[in-house]
Amino acid sequence: IKAWIIKHVLANPKKSIVLPILFTLFMGMGVNYLVIDDDMMAMLPETLESKMSWDAVQDEFGSTEVIFIAFGNKNKTIYHPKAFSLLWSLTKDLEALKEVEKVSSIATLSRIDSQDGFMEISDLQPDQELSLNQIDQIKDYLEKNSSIKQRAVSQNDEYFNIMIQPYEDIPHDVMRDVVVAVGDSVLSDDYDIHYGGTAYITGSVPTMIRNDITVLLRIGLLIMAVVLMINLRNIFAVMMVFAVIIQSLVVMAGFMGWMVFLTGSERFYFTIINSSMPIILLTIANSDGVHFVAKFFKEMRKKKDVNKSLEVTMDTILVPIFLTSLTTIAAFSSLSFAPIKQLMGYGICISVGIAHAFILSTTFLPAAISIKKWDMSSSAVTRASVFERAITYFGKKVTSNPKLILSGGILIGLVGIVGLFYLKVDVNIASFFRQGTEFRDSIDFIDQEMTGTMDVRVRLEGSMKNPSTLNEMVDLQKMLENNKKVTTSYSIADVV
């Protein structure tokens, strides 16, 4: 088979170039069907106990993921008529959105007062325009009811907080866009505005994934281009390696889209887990192409003949690249058995990209090299690169000092094993983003000044009319609030 491939590729170079390109273009059309999914909960196994509990809460109480809007000014009290007027307008505009199920703010909350032995329930903010006396009454009521205040006003009375709950079937990216649009349109530049909450974070993920992938690919390709130019010293050779990389990426992304189109399966949605796929495939495809081109130049120095050099290169490289690709594909395909369903799509799609990189490296690449008119006096052909000379020197040191190299490898391995005991697992979504960015600053602000961007929902089954049930809820809340990372808790027991 190897001899047949070598003969066929070198005898039909144009065919070996055109067919892979046509296949790449066809597969690339599948990108139109690619779906970017922002639902982080969808990545959890359906049989996970906490996921089942979360689904039960969703089914009974609706969406548990909210967006927070906080506005105000540092070192300035929020208790003034203009702020209450804006809060009223913003709340009403948010309630008018078809994507919004519920809005919670001072403008929607009720107050319970005792009048002549009777319980009187009224609106906490009765009108949009308030007098200073009415504002003082609202402030006094909030000071007496700290659990309500913690949800509506910041710790230092500088910011108002609004909680927006979407309908369960509304995508978070859609929800995030409409809420931010309303918030920015109503609130003036006189106020600091902060957005947060899990729905806001996950709604921002699709755009962030696209931006991050674009930046990472540009940086990766730039670094790769510099290294390849230093090593290969030939623009055409570098371009051919890039052609292998880009076509592999296109086929991988296109295959993912085609699978969504043909199966409709969420396993092939592009989620935050998949954001590492392009960089991983880039390195693998680059490795295949560079191995081939570097070996070709090495043979050219000896034989001074393109076809003979290609024959020897293909005869030497084809099987190792095939075995490397096969074992890598097998490793990624094993993700099909992972409990997280998106990992199945991850493994299959990146395996397709790896397979295409192998095909391109053994057909398209040698065919393109064979039709190129090479300058036998160029430095790429006549002299070994600095990297090649360094590796040759290193190889001699390894073979002449086997015990030292083996001991050093074992020592590094032991240090790595010790490091495993210091490994930390971080599940805080805020740590995904760099400090100092607008996104991270808003999350930190709501965590520090408000009730926080993350919450825990507890679903209790029992009679709400039974005093013992309510007392147990109160005990549970007290236990939770003893945790220094819990800012507040509330339940029907607080109302009763």
Descriptions of predicted regions:
Residues 32-78, 132-152, 395-396, 422-464:
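Solvent-exposed, non-transmembrane loop/terminal regulatory segments of multi-pass membrane proteins
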Residues 83-94, 174-183, 472-480:
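Short amphipathic alpha-helices in soluble, non-transmembrane regions
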Residues 67-73, 147-184, 194, 455-463:
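A short beta-strand structural signal in non-transmembrane regions
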Residues 49-52, 93-164, 171, 181, ...:
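Extracytoplasmic
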Residues 43, 64, 77-85, 122, ...:
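Solvent-exposed, non-transmembrane alpha-helical starts
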